[in-house]
Amino acid sequence: MNALVLGATGLCGSSFLKYASQNSGFDKVYAITRRDLPSELKTDSVVSVVSSETNKWGELIPEDATVLLTGLATTRAAAGGFENQYKIDHDMNVELAKVAKAKGYKVCVLVSSLGANENSFLPYLKLKGETERDIIALDFDKTIILRPGGLLGERNGTFKGFGDKYFSKISSCFYRSKLQSALGYPIYGDEVGKVGVKLALDSSRTEKVQIVSSPELLKLAEEK
């Protein structure tokens, strides 16, 4: 079995790639990225495809994979505004998932967000909810929606996470504490990736659509 990872240079996507490439359940793990992968992610089972022309990524989606793991996302600041963020977080995810489905992919794992709701009055949560809705509508054999709380972790030597670095540092103080619910159950991106890969390969869970909350993600991440 082969998998494709989108967003593989990001916080959760890089963890998808890490755990999928280490898992014997996958023979090959493809990664389509805009920039080269870090050296530690270039293992024997990883097939790296680098292209800055994101409008052509659909053509690069391999036909011999059946599992899509996507952590493709950006921030409003990095994208230069909410409209551009929407084009990446929603439009790219949905369009690429649509191509993957047409090429025979059976499983889609999407990193969403705590509080995602297509009817939310908060633009970010509405964006995530609409992305979930449209991915589910593609009707994969199995769709797994991961809804982490505040994301913790480091990427490329810079502290990254939900909100600014100060919020992330505060969240880390509440990580797995009795007060974790007050900050939306913060979780490390590495844990999100670990759980996503595990659920993608778990044939014992037969639900067509699985929505996994941050508390459940934290619980599953503790399991070996």
Curated annotation (Swiss-Prot):
The keyword Transit peptide applies. It holds the Pfam family NAD_binding_10. Signal peptide: none annotated. GO terms for cellular component: mitochondrial outer membrane. Its main location: mitochondrion. It is a peripheral membrane protein. GO terms for biological process: import into nucleus. Coiled coil: none annotated. The keyword Transit peptide applies. It is found in: Mitochondrion outer membrane. InterPro entries: NAD(P)-bd_dom, NAD(P)-bd_dom_sf. Keywords: Membrane, Mitochondrion, Mitochondrion outer membrane, Transit peptide. Belongs to the FMP52 family. PANTHER family: OXIDOREDUCTASE HTATIP2. This is Protein FMP52, mitochondrial.
